[in-house]
Curated annotation (Swiss-Prot):
Gene that encodes the chain: ileS
Protein name: Isoleucine--tRNA ligase
Locus of motif 'HIGH' region: 66-76
Entry's free-text remark on domains: IleRS has two distinct active sites: one for aminoacylation and one for editing. The misactivated valine is translocated from the active site to the editing site, which sterically excludes the correctly activated isoleucine. The single editing site contains two valyl binding pockets, one specific for each substrate (Val-AMP or Val-tRNA(Ile)).
Note on cofactor: Binds 1 zinc ion per subunit.
InterPro entries, sorted: aa-tRNA-synth_I_CS (IPR001412), aa-tRNA-synth_Ia (IPR002300), Anticodon_Ile_BEm (IPR033708), Ile-tRNA-ligase (IPR002301), Ile-tRNA-ligase_type1 (IPR023585), Ile-tRNA_ligase (IPR050081), M/V/L/I-tRNA-synth_anticd-bd (IPR013155), Rossmann-like_a/b/a_fold (IPR014729)
Motif ('KMSKS' region): 622-626
Record GO biological process: isoleucyl-tRNA aminoacylation
A Pfam family per the record: tRNA-synt_1
Gene Ontology terms, MF aspect: aminoacyl-tRNA deacylase activity; ATP binding; isoleucine-tRNA ligase activity; tRNA binding; zinc ion binding
């Protein structure tokens, strides 16, 4: 370090060693941080980190790709900064931990943007070229934002799911799971968004409250004799009546094909003013009240006795097109929590209905499926053709009422499925899609996908641990994965499908590889322009190109294949050590990645999963435009500094919600200043210290210096343990305590007298500086993962010849003999010092003393405390920061106390101690004896402090 003193000030008559440093007190972060970002890029710091780490064990944090659309928000900042802390801490722990950022580029949001800008009639080729350009522009914009946050990575060479090599490798991954037998085509109800015009993944569905009409509808008796027999009656008492269902989806009534009862629930035949009604016995009283009817139970029967009975469609009298009957099927999923205990079944629009009807012998061609992809009924549907299902709801209620089938109608607010992009309601809709079968046995005869994935969950470490059960439950209960989408901007499911049978071409695997080669050269556009005859010759007359695209969750879910082992295999490796994302990714990227790796490799693609919560305001409310409580990371970085965002994230327990507000940021800023002031003190007091020239051997250090280094080494061991377990908030909490209490409140406070008043080149002062040198090395490195700009700024002052702190590893402190005993002893001394400080404060309040140096204390101590205090000899006064200190032995702890008296001596002009020998030298009447010695003779001798 430089040897410059603060020579801009006039020299004092009796100078002290007050040094300066180019590391300023004010961080001026908004101004300085962008300069560091620029410098890191220009000087190739990330590449230098990689070079320094070459040959070490690899640690791979695989970046879950954000979507290439829109500005980065606070959630992005949380995610990227947490990743940056992990990567930097692993590099400094001695690993080669590259960070390759990535982006998710295909899919609906970008396609929507292109439609907004250019309309919906663009040719497919133009949609793709404009989508590529748009995604590229968004990536560059987001990249600037991430770099501004101090995140180091391979920004020049990120992975993008739209890069040709990644698109091609994704097709090869598809080929792998087809080869293993997991993929099939079938008709099933899937999540369907009318605005997307496509199936949705489970992760693309969110729930919001919605108000819909709820109706109780009667299906009239079609087989009165059989119904009477089922209830043990010779005949029904009257002909009018039927079975009653309750539904919140009137629009499904036109597609009704069955009724479901629970086999063990008891059903009652109730005589009412509206005829005989069949209702679950335990729901009779509630239903009579709701229907405003009086009723008498005529007979009862368990559901199993009613199986196979048929009832007329409730609109049979309204239009001949509904003159059909619905059979009673049995289903364990029927409950009596609400409604009538009878479920109407439209198998095209409900998973349980679909499964039940399939189990009872219905085939795909039997299903009534009148709702088109845009949410309108087909024109040929009686009474409601061409209507949107939402517009049809009230008209269906009217028609049911006119037909005499409606018993009750009212509004009902419930949690309902919505598209996460459009925020509009979605439905289950039976469509022909490509699926990955969760319970399919692969061709090699191994375990099912579900079994393999659950084993993968068991083998994964979770941070926090509750994530394991959450993901396990999701995998255990999920339906088959709908792989296909009906869009343009996505990786094609590049199949040739037989026009009549719907079967895949027998050479599908070979053909997929041929398509992949073309995609590798010119992107997914190659499939759009491909003439089938190029690949299948005369078979082109029999087969058509499949127009479906892959679910974008397959894009990101196969990055373990097309990134870790594909585009970036030279830097990365499989499996990754860690995936780190928000808690929503248990049903998103964590989930899809697990399924694809289970199919391809029979294992999870990660060794560990780290989950963080979402940001909320200071009152725990989610951030929203309507509440006006959102916080923009750009604005905070430009006003307070990205370092404040980084410190906030690191100091917050990310396993729950991350609360942020102006008040919280204010507290974080105050904490930052304390750390910065500590660094400034360290750097200033090392500014005339050259380790090679001035370092003192460990065994010659003063005792308190040995203690400080031993204590810091012990703390570092704790901190590295936290870093290894990704526990960052304890790291910050302990470092803030270390800076404010262990250093600022104790060690540095004690040290000031020695640093400032001892002879500049004395052993006592150089001992202190040697200890500070080691402490600074250690402190900057454990701060660096989260206080990235500040640690680098301080490092360049501390070690100007070094390129960057980020090529360093955690500090190897010198070994201090007897460190455990030393730490234990000084813990006692600090405890006593606390009692002395309290006594001094009481004396100051009583106006008996001014500063602590005006005091002389007598410490009454027993046992180990007495031994520790007396071992310091005359240096005890320096530890207590008093002008004199004596120790009085007492028998036990009950007798321990502190006596404080004002010194009767003069104050030394230079060191401010009150001493008997002030003025002992006539030429220097305001100096004490030790200051005279330190300035003009050999200097005082200290051993402990």
């Amino acid at each position: 370090m430089s040897n410059k003193k603060a020579d801009s000030k006039p020299q004092a008559k009796y100078p002290v060693n007050l040094l300066d440093t180019p590391f300023p007190m004010r961080g001026d972060l908004p101004k300085r941080e962008p300069q560091w970002v620029k410098e890191w890029e220009e000087r190739g710091i990330y590449e230098k980190i990689r070079a320094a780490s070459a040959g070490r064990p690899k640690f791979i944090l695989h970046d879950g790709p954000p979507y290439a659309n829109g500005d980065i928000h606070l959630g992005h900042a949380v995610n990227k900064i947490l990743k940056d802390i992990v990567v930097k801490s692993r590099n400094m722990a001695g690993f080669d931990a590259p960070y390759v950022p990535g982006w998710d580029c295909h899919g609906m949001p970008i396609e929507i943007q292109i439609e907004k800008q250019f309309g919906k009639s663009l040719p497919a080729a133009e949609v793709m070229s404009k989508a590529r350009a748009y995604a590229t522009e968004q990536i560059e914009k987001q990249k600037v934002g991430f770099k501004r946050l101090g995140v180091l990575g391979d920004w020049a060479n990120p992975y993008k799911t739209m890069n040709f090599v990644n698109e091609a490798e994704e097709l090869r991954a598809l080929g792998k799971i087809i080869e293993k037998g997991y993929v099939y085509r079938g008709l099933k109800p899937v999540n369907w968004c009318f605005d997307c015009g496509s199936a949705l993944a489970e992760a693309e569905v969110e729930y919001k409250d919605r108000t819909d009409p709820t109706i109780d509808v009667m299906f009239a008796f079609a087989e009165p004799e059989k119904t009477a027999q089922a209830f043990g009656l010779p005949a029904l008492p009257r002909a009018e009546g039927g079975i009653v269902i309750w539904t919140t989806t009137p629009w499904t009534i036109p597609a009704n094909q069955a009724l479901n009862l629970h086999p063990e629930i008891v059903y009652a035949l109730v005589d009412t003013e509206r005829g005989l009604l069949i209702i679950a016995e335990e729901r009779v009283e509630a239903c009579m009240t709701d229907f405003k009817l009086t009723g008498r139970v005529v007979a009862t029967a368990p559901g199993v006795k009613l199986a196979g009975l048929r009832f007329h469609h409730p609109l049979a009298s309204a239009h001949p097109g509904y003159k059909r009957t619905a059979p009673v099927y049995l289903g364990d999923y029927v409950t009596t929590d609400t409604g009538t205990g009878v479920v109407h079944s439209s198998p095209a629009y409900g998973i349980e209905d679909f499964v039940s009807c399939k189990a009872h012998g219905m085939t795909d061609s039997d299903f009534i499926n009148p709702v088109m992809g845009d949410g309108r009924y087909i024109e040929s549907l009686p009474l409601f053709g061409g209507l949107s299902i939402w517009d049809a709801n009230p008209k269906i209620v009217e028609a049911l009422n006119a037909a005499g089938s409606l018993l009750r109608s009212e509004k009902y607010t419930h949690s309902y499925m919505h598209c996460w992009r459009h925020k509009t309601p979605i439905i289950y809709r039976a469509t022909s899609q490509w699926f990955a079968g969760m319970d399919v046995t692969p061709r090699d005869g191994g375990k099912t996908l579900r079994e393999t994935a659950l084993e993968g969950v068991d083998a994964t470490a979770f941070y926090p641990s509750w994530g394991k059960q959450r993901l396990f439950s999701m995998i255990a209960n999920r339906p088959d994965w709908t792989l296909s989408r009906q869009r343009q901007w996505g990786v094609p499911m590049a199949f040739f499908v037989h026009k009549e049978t719907g079967e895949l071409h027998p050479r599908t695997l070979e053909l997929l590889e041929e398509v992949a080669k073309r995609v590798e050269q010119s992107g997914i556009e190659a499939w759009q322009t491909l003439d089938p005859r190029e690949l299948i010759g005369d078979d082109a007359n029999l087969y058509e190109k499949n127009r479906d695209t892959l679910d974008v969750w397959f894009d990101s879910g196969t990055t373990h294949w097309h990134v870790l082992r594909g585009s970036h295999k030279d830097q990365l490796q499989f499996p990754a050590d860690l995936y780190l994302e928000g808690s929503d990714q248990h049903r998103g990227w964590f989930h899809s990645s697990l399924l694809t790796a289970s199919m391809i490799d029979g294992r999870a693609p990660y060794k560990g999963l780290l989950t963080h919560g979402f940001t909320v305001d200071g009152e725990g409310r989610k951030m929203s435009k309507s509440l006006g409580n959102g916080i923009d990371p750009h604005e905070v970085a430009n006003r307070l500094g990205a370092e404040i965002i980084r410190l906030w994230i690191a100091s917050t327990d990310y396993s729950g919600e991350l609360a942020i507000s102006e008040e919280i940021l204010k507290r974080v800023t105050e904490g930052y200043r304390r750390i910065r002031n500590t660094l400034r003190f360290l750097l200033a007091n090392l500014s005339d210290f050259d380790f090679a020239q001035h370092a003192v051997p460990v065994d010659e250090w003063l005792e308190i210096d040995r203690y400080a280094v031993a204590f810091s080494q012990q703390l570092q061991t704790e901190l590295l343990g936290h870093y290894e377990k990704y526990e960052f908030h304890p790291v910050v909490a302990k470092l803030q305590t270390y800076c404010s209490e262990d250093l600022g409140g104790f060690y540095l406070d004690v040290l000031k007298d020695r640093l400032y008043t001892s002879a500049a080149d004395s052993r006592a002062r150089r001992s202190a500086q040697t200890a500070l040198y080691h402490l600074t090395h250690g402190l900057l490195r454990v701060l660096a993962p989260f206080l990235s700009f500040t640690a680098e700024e301080a490092w360049k002052v501390f070690q100007p010849a070094s390129d960057t702190i980020y090529t360093e590893t955690y500090y190897a402190y010198p070994e201090v003999a007897g460190s455990a005993a030393l730490i234990e002893k000084w813990a006692l001394l600090r405890d006593v010092r606390g009692n002395v400080t309290k006594a001094l404060e009481e004396a100051r309040t009583a106006n008996r003393i001014g500063s602590s140096l005006q005091a002389e204390v007598a410490v009454h101590a027993s046992g180990a405390r007495y031994d520790a205090l007396t071992s310091l000899g005359d240096d005890l006064k320096f530890v207590l920061i008093t002008s004199a200190a004596t120790v009085v032995k007492v028998d036990d702890e009950a007798q321990e106390s502190v006596d404080v008296a004002a010194s009767k001596y003069q104050k030394c002009e230079r060191c401010w101690h009150y001493r008997e020998d002030v003025g002992a030298h006539a030429d220097h009447p305001t100096l004490c004896g030790r200051c005279f010695s330190n300035l003009f003779e050999n200097g005082e001798i200290r051993s402990a402090a």
